UniProtKB/Swiss-Prot annotation:
GO terms for biological process: translation. Belongs to the universal ribosomal protein uL3 family. It comes from the Bacteria. This is Large ribosomal subunit protein uL3. GO terms for molecular function: rRNA binding; structural constituent of ribosome. Residues 137-159 are annotated as: Disordered. Keywords: Ribonucleoprotein, Ribosomal protein, RNA-binding, rRNA-binding. Part of the 50S ribosomal subunit. Forms a cluster with proteins L14 and L19. It comes from Renibacterium salmoninarum (strain ATCC 33209 / DSM 20767 / JCM 11484 / NBRC 15589 / NCIMB 2235). Gene3D superfamilies: 3.30.160.810, Translation factors (2.40.30.10).
Length: 220
């Protein structure tokens, strides 16, 4: 299926959060993303692949650590091997060329973007931390079960526990997308994106910044 909209995107590294002043002398919390060394490694077209897309590579890697098929893939694009690769479906893939370098200037201040990343891993967590359960009462007969989930519903009917029931387990470390964030500022010289608010992931993790899928219209 061919994309019906133009999507711009770039891979970067989350450096952390800070505060900056806006034009109204108000402090704005922003996340700093460094997005350098992005190159186009492959182009998809509807005639050959059935859809249009652009593949982007990011991050340097020792060529000795790259498999032979991937090494040939990067060599065909005329670029050095990259550690991370992502594909974006877009209707304007013909506007790109193999080996083209992408910078943070593909975005502009005030633009709405979505940020995709891997959330922080929390390890094995109980239902109160993982799902926000209230727990059992502090008294009135409660005995060593204050943080337990309670009944999981497996009585003689239906004689089983339903799939997807909220229970204790590993928390975090999952792919997460934060929608409709605003690009506060761009530093092209240092390849930095300043994005209002928080984005998923820990410092040093790779994130994808792309054109917003949905845009919120005030008063609509």
């Amino acid at each position: 299926m061919t994309a019906i909209r133009n999507v711009k995107g770039i891979l970067g590294t989350k450096l952390g959060m800070t505060q900056v002043w806006d034009e109204n002398n108000k402090l704005v919390p922003v996340t700093v993303v460094q997005a350098d060394s992005n190159v186009v490694t492959q182009l998809r077209d509807a005639a050959k692949d059935g859809y249009t897309a652009v593949q982007i590579g990011y991050g340097q890697i020792d060529p000795r650590k790259v498999t032979k098929p991937l090494a040939g893939h990067f060599e065909k694009a005329g670029v050095t091997p990259r550690r991370h690769v992502v594909e974006l479906r877009t209707n304007d893939s013909d506007a790109y060329s193999l080996g083209q370098e992408l910078s943070v200037e593909i975005f502009e201040a005030g633009q709405k973007v979505d940020v995709v990343g891997t959330s922080k891993g929390k390890g094995f967590a109980g239902v109160m931390k993982r799902h926000g359960f209230h727990g059992v009462g502090a008294s009135h007969g409660a005995h060593k079960n204050h943080r337990k989930p309670g009944s999981i519903g497996g009585a003689s009917t239906p004689s089983r526990v339903f799939k997807g029931l909220k229970m204790a387990g590993r928390m975090g470390g999952e792919r997460h997308t934060t929608l409709n964030l605003t690009v506060h500022a761009i530093d092209a010289e240092k390849s930095l994106l300043l994005i209002k608010g928080a984005i998923p992931g820990a410092r040093g993790r790779v994130v994808l910044v792309r054109t917003a899928v949905k845009t919120t219209v005030k008063g609509a």
